[in-house]
UniProtKB/Swiss-Prot annotation:
Source taxonomy: Bacteria, Bacillati, Bacillota, Bacilli, Bacillales
Provenance organism: Staphylococcus aureus (strain MSSA476)
Protein origin, superkingdom: Bacteria
Protein name: Uncharacterized lipoprotein SAS0401
Family annotation (NCBIfam families): SA_tandem_lipo
Cystine pairs: none
Length: 263
């Protein structure tokens, strides 16, 4: 009987040891994702463009090559599309957003786009209110092509800065404990990271935009398309500062490379 008790105790210790080792292993994986994990792959996919941040001179993109596939026609050097948009709910049931998109054609070495001011409504049937102003990039400066009555708005557009012009993701590889969402049938991949208000990129966003919430934001790295690269899908960054209905606040940004004929 005494022998059986010792045997049972020994087996229990072995099982407990295996369980603890398993937990430690899972914890290490969460904090330090393996090279082949989906989190590591998402970071690697984003690093192809984020390593270029900050892009001080947008016209440098004319000389930057991006991911190419069969969607490109022979001789097409491709087009970079860059966009930054800030959205905030200032009234119940309304969302106001402003932002700019530019298409930098590497064949023609021209950059055209528009600045958009938009208000969307939760109320069913109420139409979105939107105003677009055509712009172009000349000597790394934004030039407004449409007449803008509001002098302050014109100045705001001309001095607009894309997130990619001042953001820095050199430490992206050190971001830990990402919340990963995957649907390989679509396909899409997403990694979410809690960022502190002391984060350099967060500080710069708070300086540039009317972010009233004190909450620390969630950074989303979203890939729509092949995680290894595709000119059909897109990659987008989003900083979500608040999801509260009456104070929803976020900034979205993307830099993508694709065939020129798609613009």
């Amino acid at each position: 009987m005494e022998y059986l008790k010792r045997l049972a105790l020994f087996i229990s210790v072995i099982i407990l040891t295996i369980f603890i080792m398993g937990c430690d292993s899972q914890s290490d994986t969460a904090e330090n994702p393996k090279e082949g994990s989906k989190e590591a792959q998402i970071k690697k996919s984003f690093s192809k463009t984020l390593d270029m941040y900050p892009i001080k001179n947008l016209e440098d993109l004319y000389d930057k090559e991006g991911y190419r596939d069969g969607e490109f026609k022979k001789g097409d050097k491709g087009t970079w599309t860059i966009s930054t948009d800030f959205a905030k709910s200032n009234k119940p049931g309304e969302m106001d957003s402003e932002g700019m998109v530019l298409h930098l054609n590497r064949n023609m070495r021209t950059a055209t786009g528009h600045y958009t001011i938009r208000t969307t409504y939760d109320e069913l049937g109420k139409m979105t209110r939107e105003k677009n102003y055509r712009v172009e990039l000349k000597n790394n400066k934004i030039v407004v092509l449409d007449k803008v009555e509001d002098v302050n708005l014109k100045h705001k557009i001309e001095n607009f800065k894309f997130f990619s012009q001042y953001a820095d993701f050199k430490d992206l590889k050190n971001y830990k404990n990402g919340r990963i969402s995957i649907n390989e049938n679509v396909p899409y991949y997403e990694a979410e990271y809690k960022r502190n208000n002391s984060d350099g990129n967060v500080k710069k966003l708070r300086e540039k935009y009317p972010i009233t919430t004190k909450q620390s934001p969630i950074l989303k790295l979203h890939i729509d398309g092949d995680i290894k690269g595709s000119s059909v899908g897109y990659k987008q960054i989003e900083y979500m500062f608040s999801k509260e209905k009456e104070d929803e606040t976020f900034m979205s940004d993307f830099l993508n490379f694709g065939p020129s004929h798609s613009n």
